[in-house]
Amino acid sequence: MDPAEMRYLEEEDGPLMKTIKGSITGFGAGTIYGTILATWKDVPRVERNVALPGLIRTLKMMGTHGLTFAAIGGVYIGVEQLVQNFRSKRDFYNGAIGGFVAGASVLGYRARSIPTAIAAGATLAVTSALIDSGGQTTRVDNGREYYPYTVEKRAEADS
């Protein structure tokens, strides 16, 4: 294995922390998505003994979509990290496997349909593989380090 690739595999975040971050990010994205969907729907009629029915419906949609996206993000990152550590390689196959498992398990379980599970898994796998295969060229180490400050003195600062 290439030393640069080994350095990339030895990040400060472990697989568990990456999985937690993926779940939290998915929950945030799903909550925002649920909020947007709730604004497009009609507000229900005022019901007896229900205070603020529009707010309750919005919060339910936010929670439902947030938890679904959190599960997809957590399963995707978890399986990707598991496959990456098992294979000791970092390529687009890891993301494709993670995408298929996440789509098939979470969305297939939610729809309770095997054809839907296979279609969702294949869609997420292809999407992940396309994104990963296109983005691998930007991670080449060119040896330059960029600092948020200058390391060279300016001539004006000396006088």
From Swiss-Prot:
It is found in: Plastid, Chloroplast outer membrane; Mitochondrion outer membrane; Mitochondrion inner membrane. GO terms for molecular function: porin activity; protein homodimerization activity. Keywords: Acetylation, Chloroplast, Ion transport, Membrane, Mitochondrion, Mitochondrion inner membrane, Mitochondrion outer membrane, Plastid, Plastid outer membrane, Porin, Transmembrane, Transmembrane beta strand, Transmembrane helix, Transport. The chain crosses the membrane at residues 24-40, 62-79, 92-109. The modification N-acetylmethionine is found at M1. It is a multi-pass membrane protein. The keyword Cell membrane does not apply. One of its GO terms (biological process) is monoatomic ion transport. InterPro entries: TIM22. GO terms for cellular component: chloroplast; chloroplast outer membrane; cytosol; mitochondrial outer membrane; mitochondrion; plastid outer membrane; pore complex; TIM22 mitochondrial import inner membrane insertion complex. Its main location: plastid. It holds the Pfam family Tim17. Residues 1-65 are annotated as: Contains beta strands. Disruption phenotype: Lethal when homozygous. Homodimer and oligomers in membrane. Part of both the NADH-ubiquinone oxidoreductase complex I and of the TIM17:23 complex. Interacts with TIM23-2. Belongs to the Tim17/Tim22/Tim23 family. Plastid outer envelope porin OEP16 (TC 1.B.30) subfamily. Voltage-dependent high-conductance channel with a slight cation-selectivity; selective for amino acids but excludes triosephosphates or uncharged sugars. Non-essential amino acid-selective channel protein and translocation pore for NADPH:protochlorophyllide oxidoreductase A (PORA) and possibly PORB. This is Outer envelope pore protein 16-3, chloroplastic/mitochondrial.
